[in-house]
Amino acid sequence: MDIKEFAQKTIQRFGTHDPFDICNQLGIVILYLPLGRMRGYCYSNENGKAVVLHGGLAEHEARVVCAHELGHVLLHPNLNRIYLDTSTFVCERKLENEVNAFAVCLLFPDDNELLENCSTISELSIYMGVRLELAQLRSMYIGV
């Protein structure tokens, strides 16, 4: 199953594409803490799973980071990985690319809407309100 299909099945299973709602349905605790340069991370232990978000993130940014961390929980349930922000957000590691692709496919599931409003990756980035690198990942599934 490819990442877009996995994101679509996740939306169908939970009846929403909101990562906060999905976390709630899964019993994943969401915490907001001051994290310095770190935007978020997820972890699991004997008490359950949690997504920790930087308390200073704007709402839209928090949704993207939450979707990213949810991707780690769903795609890589046995790993405790930390999502570190870098100035260019260039993630060449396979796991990070997978969860980034999952996040943008979850948050922006409608190919037709994106195609109607965007003809370039730059337009897609602006329309979705995400960094260019995330828009590039989403564009792979719609041919922009």
Predicted features along the sequence, with ranges:
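Active-site hotspot residues in diverse enzymes, especially metal/ion-binding acidic/histidine motifs
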Residues: M1-V144
